[in-house]
UniProtKB/Swiss-Prot annotation:
Assigned GO CC terms: cytoplasm
Keyword Chloroplast: no
Residues at the catalytic site: C118 (proton donor)
Protein name: UDP-N-acetylglucosamine 1-carboxyvinyltransferase 1
Enzyme Commission no: 2.5.1.7
Organism: Staphylococcus saprophyticus subsp. saprophyticus (strain ATCC 15305 / DSM 20229 / NCIMB 8711 / NCTC 7292 / S-41)
Reactions catalysed, as given in the entry: phosphoenolpyruvate + UDP-N-acetyl-alpha-D-glucosamine = UDP-N-acetyl-3-O-(1-carboxyvinyl)-alpha-D-glucosamine + phosphate
């Protein structure tokens, strides 16, 4: 069967402007959250990615009228019906688990296929389940392919998360907004996307305090009305283009950013020696090698984002010494390492830390094992001498809007082929 590949002839200098899109990690939670509304909802600034399309079609399976026009989604839930959600859609998309919290909040029950998405090693949803149980839900996990969750009624509870989890924080919020009484989530995730989802729910009439801190308080309400919401800019997409600009850019401007959201990355790029000028909602970056070696450790927000650990790695081959990247969130998130070795990189990974030495990359055939590994291989391909062919590009399209045409507009020699 023919599949699409991305091909890159490296070594070009890129210049121009990039308009950053809405945050994938917000969008994939806000679309399911629209189920909780009892009237029409408009969501603007959505990224044009396959994950959004999959979620919109899942809403259709619940008899919700949807209209997706570019970056704007209109949702009319007036004739919503509860229905089991099929595996074939759910298994392609990790964030489909937000349908659990949203359907539990709306109907007090749901049957849903088990979530898929990027294979990053163990990412259990035990904290989500712990939260649902605390609110009064019973969970039937007897099937290997789906999960049944139901509650006679949902009652507010104090929930302490054993690990800081964006997914669990948001999912518990979704289930709790219409529960009876107060829910308190302790050790909550503080990511900007958590705040964005809380702001969306508040615009529907939810009573949520403390989003963006480690303690979130939710007072349940009986009804949620319609609203209009603009998704925040994507700090990971912006960060990926910042890494690309630092690798091979000459005066690249990235528009539609929130500087504080990308600060953990800009601090590291400046430590490398990258020339960055940050404005109110944009950044101008140019390559300024040779770079200094740096150590990077991924942490929950406001630390260095795990989703940018892979895209920044190719920059470290341009440093004048040994760099170390330690992954504390998903210690198995090093599937890009073998692919980079195929390109001639001097890199190894052991016990959650990658050791990266100065290297000259050459084009090769490589496989994108997950979304951000794919982004890493694009940065590497732009730096490499010769042609790089990236397979399994469906992962890349899950998180980056029109990345090939965007890079082309900056002067990259990049194209797609059917093979």
């Amino acid at each position: 069967m023919a599949q699409e590949v991305i091909k890159i002839r490296g070594g070009q200098t890129l210049k121009g402007e990039v308009n950053n899109h809405g945050a994938k990690n917000s969008a994939v939670a806000i679309i399911p959250a629209a189920i909780l509304a009892e009237d029409k909802v408009t969501i603007e600034g959505l990224p044009e990615i396959s994950d959004v399309e999959t979620l919109v079609s899942l809403l259709g399976d619940l008899n919700i009228k949807t209209e997706l026009d570019g970056m704007t989604l209109n949702v009319d839930p007036n004739e919503i019906e509860n229905a089991p959600l099929p595996n074939n859609k759910v298994e392609s998309l990790r964030a489909s688990y937000y349908m659990m919290g949203a359907m539990l909040g709306r109907f007090k029950k749901c049957v849903i296929g088990l979530p898929g998405g990027c294979p990053l090693g163990p990412r259990p949803i035990d904290q989500h389940i712990k939260g649902f149980k605390a609110l009064g839900a019973k969970i039937d996990e007897s099937s290997s392919t789906s999960m049944k969750i139901e509650a006679d009624k949902l009652t507010g509870a104090n929930i302490f998360l054993d690990i800081v989890s964006v997914g669990a924080t948001i999912n518990i919020m979704l289930a709790a907004v219409r529960a009876e009484g107060q829910t308190v989530i302790e050790n909550a995730a503080k990511e900007p996307e958590v705040v964005d989802v809380a702001n969306f729910l508040t615009s529907l009439g939810a009573d949520i305090k403390g989003a963006g801190t480690s303690t979130i308080k939710i007072n349940g309400v009986e009804h949620l009305h319609g609203s209009h919401h603009q998704v925040i800019p994507d700090r990971i997409e912006a960060g990926t283009y910042m890494c690309i600009a630092a690798a091979c850019g000459e005066d690249i401007t990235i528009n539609n950013i929130i500087p504080t959201h990308v600060e953990p990355l800009t601090v590291k790029l400046k430590e490398l020696g990258v020339d960055i000028q940050v404005g109110d909602d944009s950044a101008v970056i140019q390559r300024s090698t040779p770079y200094a070696s740096v150590d990077i450790k991924t942490l929950v927000y406001p630390g260095f984002a795990t989703d940018l650990q892979q895209p920044i790695t190719p920059l470290l081959f341009m440093a004048d010494g040994v760099s170390f990247v330690t992954e504390t969130i998903y210690p198995a998130r090093f599937r890009h390492v073998d692919e980079l070795k195929n390109m001639g990189a001097d890199i190894s990974a052991d016990n959650g830390t990658a050791t990266i030495k100065p290297s000259k990359l050459t084009g090769a055939e490589v496989y994108a094992s997950d979304l951000r590994a794919g982004a890493c291989l694009i940065v590497a391909g732009l730096l490499a001498e010769g042609v790089t062919t990236i397979y399994n590009v469906k992962h890349i399209y899950r998180g980056y809007t029109n990345i090939v045409s965007t890079l082309k507009s900056l002067g990259a020699d990049i194209w797609t082929e059917e093979v």
